[in-house]
From Swiss-Prot:
Membrane association type: Single-pass type II membrane protein
Organism: Shewanella loihica (strain ATCC BAA-1088 / PV-4)
The protein's name: Cytochrome c-type biogenesis protein CcmE
Role, per record: Heme chaperone required for the biogenesis of c-type cytochromes. Transiently binds heme delivered by CcmC and transfers the heme to apo-cytochromes in a process facilitated by CcmF and CcmH.
Main location: membrane
Origin organism lineage: Bacteria, Pseudomonadati, Pseudomonadota, Gammaproteobacteria, Alteromonadales
Length: 161
């Protein structure tokens, strides 16, 4: 092999190696920023089709209804804990250390984004409440099935006091 061909081969090899390295770094960055949506039942029992459960430490989104009577507030801080359930009976505890949205209530649909810290416990970094009595994220509506009913609220639930 002459010198010119060796130079071309080395250049082509370096170029292919560089493209492969950039592609792998790009895929790694995209994978670390991926937030998958799970229902409480899927967190507990795994996805229907594959049985895959989220791993401890994985960033996920979970959607469902806030279980009535599960909200516990710390009087000394903004820390709150509540349970989220779906129609299939799965339930996940969510902890959150910030102000809850104004529309947040027990019995309402929410989507919480955060890190799974135990098998059935999510440490949320963001909590989103539904916008009005008719709106529900498509994933939550599908997970809730036909059991979602319009809830009636008393005056204390409407005012939040």
């Amino acid at each position: 092999m002459n010198a010119r061909r060796k130079k071309r081969l080395a250049l082509a090899t370096a170029l292919i190696g560089g493209v492969a390295a950039i592609a792998s770094l790009l895929l790694y960055a995209l994978n670390s920023n991926l937030n998958l949506f799970y229902t409480p039942t899927e967190i507990v029992h795994g996805k229907k089709d594959t049985g895959v459960k989220p791993e401890i430490g994985q960033r996920i989104r979970v959607g469902g209804m806030v279980t009535v009577g599960s909200l516990v507030r710390d009087p000394e801080s903004l820390h709150v804990e509540f349970a989220v359930h779906d129609a299939a009976g799965g339930e996940v505890m969510v902890t959150y250390d910030d102000l809850l949205p104004d529309l947040f209530r027990e019995g309402q649909g929410i989507v919480a984004q955060g890190v799974l810290i135990e098998g059935g416990k999510l440490e949320a970094t963001e909590v989103l409440a539904k916008h009005d009595e008719n709106y529900m994220p498509p994933e939550v509506a599908e997970a809730m099935g036909q059991t979602h009913e319009k809830l009636e609220y008393d005056s204390t639930q409407k005012t939040g006091y």
